[in-house]
A protein has these predicted regions:
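Accessory carbohydrate-recognition regions in carbohydrate-active enzymes
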Residues: 24-364, 368-411, 417-475, 483-510, ...
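ATP-dependent phospho-/nucleotidyl transfer catalytic cores
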Residues: 480
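Conserved catalytic core of nucleotide polymerization and phosphodiester-bond processing enzymes
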Residues: 703
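Extracellular attachment/recognition segments
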Residues: 712
Length: 784
């Protein structure tokens, strides 16, 4: 099919998808944003996640997102596809329903009565009357006969309300609870206020200041406080406040609202309003579309079907949302930020709303590959976080949050450094990394290293010292120590220091149980915990079981292969993940958590792609000389576990991680070990992909005979030369060139099988490492 007809078909189908009739005119230019479905993954619930996403109407990495709100105030599931009522249109900063929101407020048009209550003002809607795009949202509110449209910039937005003929048309502004302020300024057609609502991770002086300007004079003003609406009042400060302003409207009359906000001040919010300029609504919509197309056009894929295009660009879109900008541009044009760590307004970048336990795996490597200049700003923001709080973040929203395990800020920082994204203050970076290995945050135990005293002395976090998820912590700390070793080597640190982190990087060996060939929690006395079930979720592990976590040796798969008795045994254990039925032990949680249910319903054995610990596992076949098995299972995952619809994911999307996995895998490679410059090969999904790098170079990936049957790599060339390695190097890709794949329906069992074809492993590729041993102590004798 010609490319032109593909785009025409895509646009027509997308317009029907969002409930708008297809139009005859088609933009012949490359228009990838029209493939994006912001509703992908929104058909989720507490019991079962198909993404746990909401339609984020935003700019890439925007400080504010906007979303229609179907859930009640404070509900983490703020938009659910199965809902049939909208309560408002919310400025949101929520990265996950489990983390929830902060600084949010909502706007809602109503007709007839000035209803402020979120249930009474709610309106029925239909997805047939809804258009959701990355840069624009439109919906018909049947209860009020009002069409609401919105478009965002980074820190501002514009609404366009189309009202019916009515003498009692209103707009509600809800500053939500937990302490808020509102003021109506009718002589300026303006409302100002602030929201202090949050879910943690903020200083005492936290506020989100907002300014709303209307283009129609008010005929009605009221404010809400203390559960009552007070007509004629213009200002309120209380736990939960808001405002209602009204107009007389003609049929089809349009009212615009300009909105901007700031975490710094009302004055800064007014400065942020300038992002809208003097453009009208339609011009701003087009500018937003252009911004998204500029970013999404960095990768052009061809030779797939419509669902694959939709899925790819929807995942690409999700990969460009988090971490969000938490900085602003002041009146002098300087980059400044309100610190969510110490409450001060300080110079420099700040980003937030991401959990590194999830996103170190592929989201940040994707940014290093495709948007290194943006990630440079993010890295500077991490340095600022350390300066302002004494720790690098592990889960930030907006400040430190108590969630998940690991010290994976080390991976984020080191992977960027190794791929040429280098901060100016390397001394502070290294100092912060070392500090994190020897300390834990005094109030947020997931920041720094909980159990570092045991880990640094024994070589593992014991099972029986009342530190949960101890085996998971040990495995991740070992990988994190390898990351630190990588940058210490680059910085020329002393040999004694290098050897310390090299030995700690081998600490994963301390948890390997040769009887089960799996990782297992270990008691302080050096004996393995008992009884042991590889199917038990949680306990020694994090949101998974031993079958999932035993592969968390990102930096040294060959070391794990050696522990398991060689490549054949290793492959047998990989195979077992798919062969074992989706059995589980949920006794640690006292019930089935959603991650367990997501594994069982996907019918792929004990492979749990809906959560992060195992997402790299399939690529490990490459290290054992059987890359064709990776090629098979990767296509299975892409075909069976991703769709472009509301049930599009097989678990939590998690701030770009599960989406970036798909984008990488569809291109044919994946960063198994962030901190190296290598990407491990899978097999491409499309017949052609063209990557446009920031440095101006282009990489073309050709697989002309790719199909749903031709999923195996028969042969491969890179810039015309035969290529047998099971990995690609970042620096080689960045130079641009052409990769040609010849695909077939049968595996080539003679390609990628030699030692020189294997990807990086710490114990093989680094001199002298095989002579080192992990930190360890001998088991103490049992008392009689």
């Amino acid at each position: 099919m010609k490319k032109k007809s593909v785009w025409a078909l895509a646009l027509a189908a997308m317009l029907m998808w969002v409930g708008k009739p297809a139009v005859a005119a088609v933009n012949e230019a490359f228009d990838p944003v029209e493939y994006v479905n912001p509703l992908m993954g929104t058909q989720s619930s507490f019991e079962l996640s198909t993404g746990n996403t909401y339609p984020a109407i935003a700019r890439p990495w925007g400080m504010n997102f906007w979303t229609p709100q179907t859930g009640k105030m404070g509900d983490g599931w703020q938009y659910v596809y199965t809902a049939n009522k909208i309560r408002g249109f919310k400025q949101t900063h929520q990265p996950s329903p489990w983390i929830n929101d902060y600084g949010q407020f909502a706007i809602m048009p109503v007709v007839g009565k000035p209803e402020f209550d979120q249930d009474k003002r709610a309106s029925w809607f239909s997805h047939k009357g809804e258009i959701a795009k990355a840069y624009y949202y439109k919906v018909y509110l049947a209860e009020h006969d009002v069409v609401t449209e919105l478009m965002p910039t980074d820190r501002a937005a514009m609404f366009r309300f189309t009202f019916p003929e009515n003498e009692h048309s209103y707009i509600v502004v809800d500053a939500l609870d937990k302490g808020s302020y509102i003021k109506v300024i009718p002589e300026e057609n303006k409302i100002i206020g602030y929201s202090t609502k949050n879910s943690g991770g903020v200083p005492d002086n936290f506020k989100n200041y907002f300014v709303i300007e209307f283009d129609k004079p008010f005929t009605y003003e009221a404010t809400f406080a203390d559960a009552s609406l007070k007509e004629g009042t213009k200002e309120q400060t209380s736990d939960h406040v808001g405002a209602v302003i009204g107009f007389k409207t003609k049929k089809g009359e349009i009212v615009h609202a300009k909105v901007a906000s700031s975490f710094i001040s009302f004055d800064q919010a007014a400065i942020n309003m300038k992002e809208l300029g003097n453009d009208n609504f339609d011009t701003l919509v087009q500018k937003g579309k252009d911004v998204w197309n500029e970013h999404l056009s960095k990768i052009e894929v061809e030779g797939g079907d419509l669902d694959q295009y939709r899925t790819f660009y929807s995942c690409f879109y999700r990969s460009l949302l988090f971490p969000r900008k938490f900085y602003e541009i002041n009146a002098q044009g300087e980059v400044v930020h309100y610190s969510p760590y110490n409450g001060e307004v300080l110079p420099g970048y700040m980003f937030t709303d991401t959990g590194f336990w999830d996103t170190f795996r592929s989201l940040f490597p994707f940014l290093n590959l495709m948007f290194p200049s943006v990630n440079k700003e993010m890295q500077e923001g991490l340095i600022n976080t350390y300066k302002e709080s004494g720790f690098f973040p592990e889960w930030a929203s907006p400040g430190h949050r108590g969630c998940m395990v690991g010290n994976n800020s080390a991976s984020i920082l080191v992977d960027a450094y190794m791929k040429g994204v280098k901060v100016d203050d390397l001394e502070t970076l290294y100092k912060g990394l070392i500090h994190g290995t020897e300390n834990v945050h005094p109030t947020v135990s997931s920041t720094g290293r909980l159990g570092h005293e045991y880990y640094n002395k024994l070589g593992y976090v014991p099972y029986d010292v009342k530190i949960n998820e101890n085996a998971a912590r040990t495995l991740e700390y070992a990988y994190n120590d390898w990351c630190i070793w990588q940058i210490a080597k680059q910085l020329g640190r002393p040999k004694k220091e290098l050897d310390l982190y090299a030995r700690r990087a081998l600490n994963y060996k301390n948890l390997y149980d040769k009887e089960t060939k799996l990782m297992r929690g270990k008691n302080e006395n050096g004996e393995f915990m008992a009884p042991f079930s590889p199917l038990k979720w949680g306990d020694a592990f994090t949101e998974g079981n031993s079958w999932h976590y035993s592969w968390s040796v990102f930096h040294d798969p060959q070391g794990l292969i050696d522990l398991m008795g060689g490549k054949d045994s290793f492959v047998m254990m990989l195979d077992s993940v798919f062969a074992v039925p989706p059995l589980f032990d949920d006794s640690y949680y006292g019930g089935v958590i959603h991650e367990i249910r997501e594994m069982t319903v996907m019918n792929m054995g004990n492979y749990a792609h809906g959560n992060q610990p195992i997402q790299h596992m399939i690529y490990l076949y490459n290290y054992a000389g059987q890359p064709w098995k990776a090629q098979y299972w990767l296509r299975q995952v892409m075909d069976r576990m991703y769709t472009p619809g509301p049930d599009g994911y097989c678990g939590d999307e998690d701030n770009g991680q599960t989406s970036a996995w798909y984008v990488f895998s569809a291109l044919g490679f994946y960063p198994v070990a962030p901190g190296t410059t290598q990407y491990v090969l899978g097999a491409p999904l499309f017949k052609k992909a063209t990557i446009h790098f920031e440095n101006g170079n282009n990489l073309v990936i050709n697989a002309p005979n790719n199909s749903d049957k031709n999923i195996y790599i028969e042969s491969m060339t890179f810039n015309g030369k035969n290529y047998t390695k099971n990995y690609l190097d970042h620096n080689d890709l960045f130079k641009g060139g052409v990769i040609d794949f010849k695909m077939g329906d049968k595996p080539n069992m003679n390609r990628g099988i030699n030692p020189e074809d294997m990807p990086y492993s710490f114990s093989v590729n680094e001199e002298g490492i095989n002579k080192l041993s992990p930190i360890s102590v001998k088991p103490s004798k049992k008392k009689k």
